[in-house]
UniProtKB/Swiss-Prot annotation:
The lineage of its organism: Eukaryota, Viridiplantae, Streptophyta, Embryophyta, Tracheophyta. GO terms for cellular component: Cul4-RING E3 ubiquitin ligase complex; nucleus. This is Protein DAMAGED DNA-BINDING 2. Keywords: DNA damage, DNA repair, DNA-binding, Metal-binding, Nucleus, Repeat, Ubl conjugation pathway, WD repeat, Zinc, Zinc-finger. It is found in: Nucleus. Residues 10-21 have a biased composition (Basic and acidic residues). A zinc finger (CCHC-type) spans 100-117. The keyword Repeat applies. Changing residue 343 to H: Does not impair interaction with DDB1A. Pfam families: WD40. One of its GO terms (molecular function) is zinc ion binding.
Length: 557
């Protein structure tokens, strides 16, 4: 019995002898072979697998034959390379490797499917232990802000239905979005190739793409505070562009690589950018930890670059306080978000350093009062500080959310709803997919930052790609999303559409640069992407489902 068990544990092997003497055989020899070997070769292999042993098959005993060994390898996990289990997608459901920590909360002992922080339709996101940061200063400050912050939260209005879209609008994936400050229907979008698109989603068909502004990825865009037809853009080519949206003409205000490509160790890229209207400066930060400033009245550089993060680390984002213009918030891949006083900008002179466990994708002050801080970290945590005047050593709460990603995606960034007077509603895309009627979809989550509960998750059955770039309109109930190379406009579902037949969506499909060509990574590009586009390009006729986009909302109490 012991020999039988040990034989079954070993991987079965099949040794087949090959005749190398001659390739020709007569019909008589073939008949003899059939008589001598009544079973086919495949049948012998199947029999060998069943017996779990080693079988040697010899068709001829001629000299010069080299045996061929066929080893049947057992299925192993693609993640840990161990047998006995599998990991990966099974249909529309992803199965975790039990030997690895949970992909969502990064803690061992359970899988993603059984994670207590998992976002599903039955319950919302569970916040970690809440720490009360209230002190006497906080209460005094809250009393001063009481006229601005309503005592009762207004009802959330969620844009949960795709109203219109432009498919394959950009030639590469969308990296950033920005609404026009005065024209409600104008949306700006930047992509990985350096193009900037201008789309009037009110008329749908009016759209332009300017490709002569940057050579590689557009990371940030801001409208000029003095001329709303002009826009500033920061790119991975190390330049800040100043573009006229009417004509498409652009000028370069800052170039960190005047001598061109000198190697990866010296190539500078600009990521975070914001405008301080009170100070009259455009702020931009690079991938070496330095802050650069441009006077937007003269469009000339002012002062020397200032080291605001660890030297050699990328500054991912900048945000100016909307109420107190002296305060600046920065974040980077040195695992810190930092608060600065712009009157005393010096290296290692930050007012406070907010520690994180991994790279901080974004950090924002709250849009109305400027007293709260919202950060998104790649440790799958969204962190909220309720008051910048209290104890900032630890966040007021942490929300576990799936925003870890691979390098072929634009980083996820949780953003405030600028219309929410209670400063509690945030929006962010989700990385982990959910199985909806047999289809793997990646919803967009609306979360209540005050308690971590899931307010709504919106999705459309036609959008099967991940949606990392999301922007809420500052005045209208509109959500703009960038998924792969496409743009989508979401609006709240009309009550009349629940009874009447849903109107057809306005969708434009652009085929301008849909054919895949030989890819060559450009200088300054920080990654390569080969994302699958929404709607398969194999079929000529693209059908759009007529049933409604599925939405799950939580009732507020």
């Amino acid at each position: 019995m012991s020999s039988t068990r040990s034989r079954r544990k070993r991987d079965p092997e099949i040794v087949i002898a090959r005749d190398t003497d001659s390739e020709l055989s007569s019909s008589e020899e073939e008949e003899e072979e059939e008589d001598n070997y009544p079973f086919s070769e495949s049948e012998e292999e199947d029999e060998a697998v069943k017996n779990g042993g080693k079988i040697e098959l010899e068709k001829n005993k001629a000299k010069g034959k080299a045996p061929i060994t066929v080893k049947l390898i057992k299925k192993v996990c693609k993640v840990c390379k161990q047998p006995g289990h599998e990991a990966g997608f099974k249909g529309a459901t992803y199965i975790d490797c039990p030997m690895k920590p949970c992909f969502l909360c990064k803690m061992p002992g359970h899988t993603t499917m059984s994670c207590p922080h998992r976002v599903v339709t039955d319950h919302g996101i569970l916040p970690t232990s809440h720490r009360n940061t209230k002190n006497p200063i906080d209460f005094v400050f809250k009393r001063q802000l009481q006229p601005r912050i309503p005592p009762i939260k207004p009802k959330y209005v969620i844009p949960d239905q795709v109203h219109c879209a432009v498919i394959r609008y950009h030639s590469r994936r969308v990296t950033c979005l920005e609404f026009h400050p005065t024209k409600n229907n104008i949306l700006l979008s930047g992509d990985k190739k350096g193009q900037i698109g201008v789309w009037d989603f009110g008329k749908v068909y009016e759209k332009n793409v300017y490709g002569n502004i940057h050579s590689v990825q557009v990371n940030n865009m801001r409208f000029s505070p003095t001329n709303d037809d002009m826009v500033y853009s920061a790119s991975s080519d190390g330049t800040i562009g100043y573009t006229d949206l009417e004509t498409g003409t652009s000028s370069t205000l800052l170039n960190l690589n005047p001598d061109g490509w000198q190697g990866a160790n010296s190539w500078k890229m600009l990521y975070g950018m914001d405008i301080n209207s009170e100070k009259g400066v455009v702020l931009a930060a690079d991938n070496f930890g330095f802050l650069h400033m441009i006077d937007h009245r003269t469009n000339n550089s002012t002062g020397e670059p200032i080291l605001i993060h660890k030297q050699g680390s990328k500054v991912c984002g900048l945000d100016c306080n909307p109420v107190q213009p002296e305060l600046l918030l920065s974040c980077g891949n040195d695992h810190f978000a930092r608060i600065w006083d712009m009157r005393k900008l010096q290296p290692k002179a930050s007012l406070h350093d907010l520690a994180h466990k991994r790279v901080v994708n974004s950090a924002y002050f709250s849009p109305s009062s400027g007293t709260k801080i919202l950060t998104t970290c790649q440790d799958n945590r969204i962190r909220i500080w309720d008051s910048i005047f209290g104890n900032l050593d630890l966040p007021s709460r942490e929300i576990v959310h799936s925003n870890d990603f691979n390098r072929h995606l634009t980083p996820f960034k949780a953003e405030w709803d600028p219309k929410d007077t209670s400063e509690s509603l945030i929006v962010i895309g989700r990385y982990i997919s959910e199985n909806y009627n047999g289809t793997a979809l990646h919803p967009i989550d609306f979360i209540d930052a005050s308690n971590g509960q899931l307010v709504a998750e919106v999705m459309d059955p036609n959008i099967t790609t991940i949606t990392p770039v999301n922007k809420l309109h500052p005045r209208d109930d509109v959500l703009a999303s960038g998924s792969s190379r496409s743009l989508f406009i979401w609006r709240p579902q009309d009550n009349t559409e629940m009874v009447e037949e849903k109107k057809d969506k306005k969708i434009i499909i652009c085929y301008g640069d849909s054919k895949k060509k030989g890819k060559k990574q450009k200088r300054g590009s920080d990654d390569e992407d080969d994302e699958d586009d929404i709607f398969s390009s194999k079929g000529k006729n693209i059908k759009v489902n007529k049933y409604q986009a599925k939405t799950t909302k939580k009732t507020k109490t």
